[in-house]
């Protein structure tokens, strides 16, 4: 069988340098898992998401005509090279790999997505917890994407079903996800299917999934001695704490 050109040193021979790069990427992934070894499952999941989003960005230069290769693979996430980036498949495979190394039950699914980065054919993850299943779209949780402030990671849909697809709410838009035939065939369409998204809030290790981060939208002192601060509401937040740095 011919070797894909980006991995080949000949038509049927794998480039030894690429093999070493893959080994180094795998070791880097194991180091991330080791770094979060003492954390709870919920903290690991958030940590893995943040690490992946720190290590890579969405590859906007990839087109349908490009050869299937590294931008679709997890190597470009863990290779330590800031210039190598991935599409949704790379984000999803990287998250799946970290979960597999941590014995966290996670699945990778495919379908269509409307309203976010990589709109169209899409790959994302589903995380299992106590027999319930939760969205984990790492691609659209990255900085600059529709879900960077929450809504698409360990969140529940506002409406939908396996057959019709699910709608998730973010601060800026509602995002639609629909499973493809392959996902439905592989995992089934009944209420015991991993494709069935729960309405119960994610909670593990006595920790509820943390609210999305907020951001300051305005600061004013029009009234003497009175500082007024406004901020975006964070989904699932019970309250807010404000800290002032002195000096």
Q: Which ranges hold each PLM region?
A:
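Secondary-structure boundary elements
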Residues: 14-80
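Loop/turn elements at helix/coil->beta-strand transitions in domains of secreted/extracellular proteins
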Residues: 40-46, 54, 83, 100-107, ...
């Amino acid at each position: 069988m011919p070797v894909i050109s980006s991995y080949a040193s000949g038509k049927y021979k794998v480039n030894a340098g690429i093999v070493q790069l893959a080994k180094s990427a795998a070791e880097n992934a194991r180091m991330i898992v080791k770094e979060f070894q003492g954390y709870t499952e919920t903290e690991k999941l958030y940590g893995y998401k943040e690490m992946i989003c720190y290590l890579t960005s969405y590859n906007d230069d990839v087109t349908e005509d490009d050869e299937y290769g590294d931008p679709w693979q997890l190597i470009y996430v863990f290779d330590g090279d800031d210039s190598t980036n991935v599409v949704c498949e790379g984000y999803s495979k990287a998250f799946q790999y970290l979960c597999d190394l941590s014995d966290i039950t996670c699945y990778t699914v495919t379908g269509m997505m409307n309203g976010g980065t990589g709109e169209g054919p899409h790959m994302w993850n589903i995380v299992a917890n106590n027999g319930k299943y939760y969205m984990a779209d790492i691609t659209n949780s990255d900085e600059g994407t529709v879900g960077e402030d929450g809504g698409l990671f360990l969140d529940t849909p506002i409406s939908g079903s396996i057959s019709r697809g699910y709608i998730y709410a973010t601060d800026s838009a509602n995002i639609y996800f629909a499973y493809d035939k392959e996902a439905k065939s592989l995992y089934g369409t009944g209420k015991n299917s991993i494709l069935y998204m729960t309405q119960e809030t994610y909670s593990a290790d006595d920790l509820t999934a943390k609210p999305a981060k907020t951001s300051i939208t305005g600061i004013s002192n029009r009234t003497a001695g009175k500082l007024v601060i406004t901020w975006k509401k964070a989904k699932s937040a019970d309250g807010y704490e404000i800290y002032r740095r002195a000096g």
